[in-house]
Amino acid sequence: MYYVTKRLEISGSHRLELSYKSKCSNLHGHNWIITVHCKSDTLNPDGMVTDFTHIKEKISGLLDHANFNDVLPFNPTAENIARWVCDQVENCWRVDVQESEGNIASYQID
């Protein structure tokens, strides 16, 4: 099994739509760290699990310096973002989304 990991640093803002009163319902920003883990039994014809540049272009290209509420079709919680990122990247099996020090959400395909 081959494993690769891509770490992305993204600046972006969001506002959460919550069923309770929270300061997170106000527009605010984070310096996000999104870690994408991919795996494959075989390598593609170029000798890779997936191209790191493709991950960066697909994820950072859309999210970096964006208001996530404007570009994502769901409530942009860290958990929802983790799942969305995993769905966007070929051979992805896990994503960790850190919105601030100590606050990390993960999505993993078992």
Predicted feature locations:
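Charge-rich, low-complexity N-terminal segments
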Residues: 1-110
